[in-house]
């Protein structure tokens, strides 16, 4: 079983109220990120702030839900995420969109997405979803004809899970404890110095680059 298939099965088990559009949205985001062009930074920050202000805190919700291909959903109701300033969350989104752009005509990622959709259909045939393979086929016929647009969550899914998240790089999830410590230092008006240690090939350079781009700081 591939990592994508295993992760898909895990998410289907965690959120069994998924309808075809919800499953497609999950797989779409794992390939194409947020799937649309982001507004200017100021608007992005205000949208995040406004949505977070309306959300009740949910301590049972994990800060991040991994969706595959190095991406995750950052859950805005999770306490650890709410503790970060909206400006930082917006910057995470912008950096992720730079690395994972929206789908384009003739996108080379489309065959991979189609493969993922075949895994979703196999899951439906195996009884892992509440919707049938026939229902998924009907949805996908219209979806493909429309040019593979970003999908929206179903009313059923929204009622069951109240999704409120942003799609970002999974590297930021790994960095969360460090980000929290850095933000504490910044809030106190103190300088922050981060030291990343680990064996060769463990990802230190990648994470250092993420930090540098996130804060505009030298490495």
Spans of features found by a protein language model:
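Conserved glycine(s) of the Walker
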Residues: 203
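Long, basic/Gly/Ser/Thr-rich N-terminal segments
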Residues: 1-157
